[in-house]
Curated annotation (Swiss-Prot):
It comes from Malacoplasma penetrans (strain HF-2). Keywords: Isoprene biosynthesis, Manganese, Metal-binding, NADP, Oxidoreductase. NCBIfam families: Dxr. Its EC number is 1.1.1.267. This is 1-deoxy-D-xylulose 5-phosphate reductoisomerase. It catalyses: 2-C-methyl-D-erythritol 4-phosphate + NADP(+) = 1-deoxy-D-xylulose 5-phosphate + NADPH + H(+). The lineage of its organism: Bacteria, Bacillati, Mycoplasmatota, Mycoplasmoidales, Mycoplasmoidaceae. SUPFAM superfamilies: 1-deoxy-D-xylulose-5-phosphate reductoisomerase, C-terminal domain (SSF69055), Glyceraldehyde-3-phosphate dehydrogenase-like, C-terminal domain (SSF55347), NAD(P)-binding Rossmann-fold domains (SSF51735).
Length: 377
């Protein structure tokens, strides 16, 4: 057998961090259908779902910071060392995912990146690390995945990158109608099947704020435009200098983006439903930046390049979502908490990882103190 044939038949080894979450769990179907090998996974405390994964993939090594189970190792680092994967799927939610992104880059492992917060809080640091790493980063967000796919063989001069957003469940509501939104309503996304945190981020537009910053770091441009597109069929577009466009379209199903990320955009397997053009109606509208402040905050960052701002936004947002779920604050209070945190901490100097970690910690403390005093819970 020729060497090339050996490589052809070799199973791709996949390590999934955050396997019991929405993205991580969805990846298991792709791993099975693509005939990859799940060599290991991590989870936090969803033991019931983890047990299901263990039964499906009995040879996979496991790490959990809170639960000991079959084939357990003691740390993220040990899990990576013992599995020696070809690619890591970072499907952790929030700031905690930064550690995994840095771990992949430092160990020269390819990365399917669903954890956008890594780039939001430390995009400049990740850019520095990538210069000395052989890792390739494949974005798993549907917008960035589709842009990556459209750009990879393109040689035309680009005028603008366009990403779309559904607007979440409240986009068409008047501002005063947002006053009494509850958590259960906010997690009901009209088009996508997503986890709780990202569903709230979609409802507040923080998700799109973060995706603008993510696109800036991934594609090295400030020329990023967002349009509300209620059908979630067109995920992204590229506008060229001759005013022609390329649009990337599919039914809203995250399996496609996960599949592209894990395969390095090489897979030919069909895992999602085809798009029907019968009675297809596509609508777009400009975002009201006064109503949806997070989009405005993202554009401000692109202009002022204050490294502290995205770290503050992310930490304050994560803490505010917890307070909202606990019914200690209202939906619109999320915006006030983030804005107050930005004003209080935006002059913090950020030059290295230690600064990122300290500002993340200090922002969370600020939110706790401010909210306790303001909302009297």
């Amino acid at each position: 057998m020729l060497e090339g044939e050996k490589m052809e038949n070799k199973k791709k080894k996949v390590l999934v961090f955050g396997a019991t979450g929405n993205i991580g769990f969805s990846s298991l179907e792709i791993i099975e259908k693509e005939n990859y090998e799940l060599v290991g996974f991590s989870f936090n405390n969803n033991y019931e779902k983890a047990l299901e994964i263990i039964n499906r993939f009995p040879n996979a090594l496991v790490f959990s910071p809170s639960v000991k189970t079959k084939n357990t190792v003691n740390s993220f680092e040990e899990l990576l060392e013992k599995t020696n994967p070809d690619i890591i799927l970072n499907a952790l939610v929030g700031f905690s995912g930064l550690h995994i992104t840095l771990l992949a880059l430092k160990n020269n492992v390819d990365l399917a990146l669903a954890n956008k917060e890594s780039l939001v809080v430390a995009g400049w640091l990740i850019e520095d690390l990538k210069r000395s790493s052989s890792s390739r980063i494949y974005p798993v967000d549907s917008e960035h995945s589709s842009l990556y796919d459209s750009l990879k063989n393109n040689n035309k001069e680009i005028k603008e990158l366009i990403i779309t957003c559904s607007g979440g469940p409240f986009y068409k509501k008047e501002f005063n109608e947002l006053l009494n939104i509850n958590f259960a309503d906010a997690v009901k996304h009209p088009n996508w099947n997503m986890g709780k945190k990202i569903s709230i981020d979609s409802a507040t537009m923080m998700n799109k704020c973060f995706e603008i910053i993510e696109a800036y770091y991934l594609f090295n441009t400030k020329k990023i435009k967002v349009y509300q597109h209620g059908q979630s069929i067109i995920h992204s577009m590229i506008k060229f200098t001759d005013n022609s466009y390329i649009a990337n379209m599919s039914v809203p199903d995250m399996k496609l983006s996960i599949q592209q990320g894990l395969s390095g955009y090489e897979s030919k397997t069909n895992l999602i439903n085809d798009l029907s053009f019968n009675n297809l109606n596509l609508t777009f509208s400009e975002i009201d930046l006064d109503k949806w402040k997070p989009i405005h905050w993202a554009y401000d960052f692109l202009e002022n390049q204050n490294r502290a701002i995205p770290i503050i936004m992310n930490a304050a947002n994560e803490e505010a979502i917890v307070l909202f779920e606990e019914n200690k604050i209202k939906f619109l209070d999320i915006f006030e908490i983030i804005e107050k945190a930005i004003i209080a901490l935006e002059n913090t100097e950020v030059n290295d990882l230690k600064d990122i970690l300290n500002l993340n910690k200090n922002t969370r403390k600020y939110v706790y103190d401010f909210s306790k005093n303001k909302f009297r819970y």
